[in-house]
Amino acid sequence: MHLLLIHQAFASPNEPGGTRHYEFARQLVQAGQRVTIVASDLSYLTGQRTTAGRGLITRQELDGIVVLRAYTYPALHRSFAWRIVSFLSFMVISVGAALRAGPVDLVMGTSPPIFQAVSAWLVAVLRRRPFLLEVRDLWPDFAIDIGVLRNPVLIALSRWLERFLYRRATHLLVNSPAYRDYLIGKGVPQEKISLIPNGVDPEMFDPEARGERLRAEWRLDGKFVVTYAGALGLANDIPTILRAADRLRDQSEVHFLLVGDGKERANLEAQAHQLGLTNVTFVGSRPKFEMAEVLAASDACLATLRDIPMFRTTYPNKVFDYMAAGRPTILAIDGVIRQVIEAAGGGIFVPPGDDAALATAVISLSQDRARSRAMGQAARAYAVEHFNRRQQAAQFAELIERLVGTKARVA
């Protein structure tokens, strides 16, 4: 069985970002299947080229996975219009790359950005193969709610494209139970939808590690370290974290660590400087393989999003990493991910945007280390049982088997 995936933001463990698709692909390859991934030659988080090649398409091999890197116009930290240009450049060149992959049995697209899903649909039509569409975020709803997409004509076109792809897909895969409900509400038959939620490989994280090397490097010895790991964009509500840090400026034992990059990073660093925050450190993005050590150096972790109704539907990847690392989550996101944290007993929920409540939660955990550790242990146990990436890879293989009619099982 040969799976072809078109995914502009695909990340390997050597890059920052989520590695869901790498982990699924690796386990398929280990089981004797073939996987080709058409990806951008730009990291979506850093904007750096991931290949040294100068052509439009560069071939790599990663743990037996064939990765075809397609040239993408750079648009990091630029306007929405330039980002559309970047998406369109990948959409066009990815089709050419996909047609170089040889015979395939299934074509998979993933959204957002929705344009790469168009590429996957077109390749599936040309190859006369089933088309599996993965919905990772509800686009364009998120873009509309954030205020990034405002033009009525573009919104109408986006809605039409969304409906077109839902109809044309052989099957739909979602990573949050709320997305399944959303699609059913859009008229997609329930039997056409499969749920494989975001999750984590627990073996990547050692809950007993304490990250002594990084604590020394970042001068965090003796501190209660509260880490946010992820994008620094408009949606992520980092200003709430900075306001909480401002409230805790006199709590010398508490330090906030912001790990990541994004369009708002420069503005956020300027804001922290203007506030005179000496209890906040920005360390930039880190490759996935380094995140175990980063989280080991942390005592508690943060997940924040703006208080927008659509964000109540999402399962943020970072939360599952926090759980597997055995660290409690201070969660300023309502909805389905709150249900996970509360079911696990793995953290504290605070209302989105409420910096006072966030600061109170930090103090609560810093002053009761036994409670904090117990929450982290409960979080890891829950993630291992319910969100184990190895079990999810087996579910993914079974889904492919149903769609293709070929054995694609993983151990």
Task: Indicate residue ranges for each PLM-predicted region.
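N-terminal subdomain of nucleotide-sugar transferases
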Residues: 1-63, 250, 408-411
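Nucleotide-activated donor-binding/catalytic signature segment of Leloir-type glycosyltransferases, i.e.
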Residues: 259, 265-293
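Short hydrophobic beta-strand element within catalytic cores of glycosyltransferases
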Residues: 300-303, 321-332
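Conserved acidic donor-binding segment of nucleotide-sugar-dependent glycosyltransferases
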Residues: 343-344, 348-355, 364-370
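A short helix/loop element that forms part of the nucleotide-sugar donor recognition site in Leloir-type
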Residues: 50-58, 206-219
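Carbohydrate-associated surface elements
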Residues: 41, 178, 199
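Conserved donor-binding/catalytic core segment of Leloir-type glycosyltransferases
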Residues: 220-236, 241-245, 257
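A short, well-ordered alpha-helix in the C-terminal region of glycosyltransferases
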Residues: 357, 364, 371-386, 395
